[in-house]
């Protein structure tokens, strides 16, 4: 089996309301690039990359000169053609490789009549739980709906998602308001959904590294009684101004 064509299409996924975070806002959509890898046997494998537009599509068109005629089973050779350990540091090559590798694995699964997990070593679980991903949100500028700013709005939104999809874990993206206000909202969320059998649902928080060490410690101590899965990136990575003795978790974990 040989690759005969590579196509890339930008896809925008609409958001029901703008999502707020420490870096600003996702205003109306998520952008992705869907990649199709076609072969001489008529099979088409699908992959995906974050981001998109003219530049992303042009990158995948350029990959045709490297990969047309290539056997999609030769994944390591493809990796060294596109993203060897030196070149992979530049121009998002690892993202491009990941989308193409995914498409090639899809092709191999189709050709061999097996699921991709068998190619990668076998399935370990029958089910994989998903968590709700909660954001503070602006109201949709067109409809005025979807705002999440208060603790009451956050809890109502989390309950809606739980009712619709059955989530038992809930991650809140912070770094938008003062840590004390976000603590109030997070505790309200845990108070509403954290009770019941087996201590109820679990919770996760991520302020995108905008807190000081002191703020992070204060927040962490204030939620020790919550069923936390993790506290993600409370401070900037490799915070040179922090005292290593302030943390009981090694900095190498990134937490």
Regions of interest found by a model, annotated:
Residues 174-255:
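Catalytic core of soluble alpha/beta enzymes
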Residues 157-173:
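Catalytic domains of carbohydrate-active enzymes, especially glycoside hydrolases
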Residues 118-147, 185, 198-202:
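N-terminal small/glycine-rich loop or linker at the start of catalytic domains
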Residues 90, 129-155, 174-175, 207-212:
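Active-site mouth loops of central-metabolism enzymes
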Residues 115-120, 154-161:
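Short, charged beta->alpha transition segments
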Residues 6, 38-112:
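Metal- or metallocofactor-binding catalytic centers and their adjacent structured scaffolds
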Residues 1-46, 50:
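Structured beta-strand/loop patches that form or line metal/cofactor-binding pockets in enzymes
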């Amino acid at each position: 089996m040989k690759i005969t064509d590579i196509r890339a299409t930008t896809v925008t996924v609409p958001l029901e309301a703008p999502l707020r975070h420490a870096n600003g806002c996702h205003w109306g959509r998520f952008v992705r690039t869907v990649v199709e890898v076609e072969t001489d046997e008529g099979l088409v494998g699908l992959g995906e990359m974050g981001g998109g537009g003219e530049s992303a599509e042009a990158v995948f068109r350029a990959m045709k000169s490297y990969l047309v005629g290539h056997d999609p089973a030769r994944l390591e050779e493809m990796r060294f053609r596109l993203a060897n350990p030196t070149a992979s540091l530049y121009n998002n090559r690892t993202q491009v490789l990941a989308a193409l590798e995914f498409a090639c694995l899809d092709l191999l699964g189709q050709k061999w009549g097996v699921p991709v997990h068998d190619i990668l070593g076998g399935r370990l679980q029958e089910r994989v739980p998903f968590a709700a991903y909660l954001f503070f949100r602006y109201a949709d500028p067109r409809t005025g709906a979807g705002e999440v700013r208060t603790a009451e709005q956050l809890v109502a939104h989390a309950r809606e998602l739980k009712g619709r999809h059955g989530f038992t874990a809930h991650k809140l993206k912070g770094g938008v308001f003062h840590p004390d206000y976000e603590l109030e909202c997070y505790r309200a969320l845990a108070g509403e959904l954290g009770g019941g059998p087996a201590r109820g649902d679990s919770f996760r928080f991520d302020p995108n590294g905008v807190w000081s060490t002191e703020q992070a410690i204060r927040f962490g101590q204030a939620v020790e009684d919550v069923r936390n899965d993790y506290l993600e990136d409370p401070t900037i990575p490799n915070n040179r101004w922090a005292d290593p003795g302030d943390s009981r978790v090694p900095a190498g974990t990134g937490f």
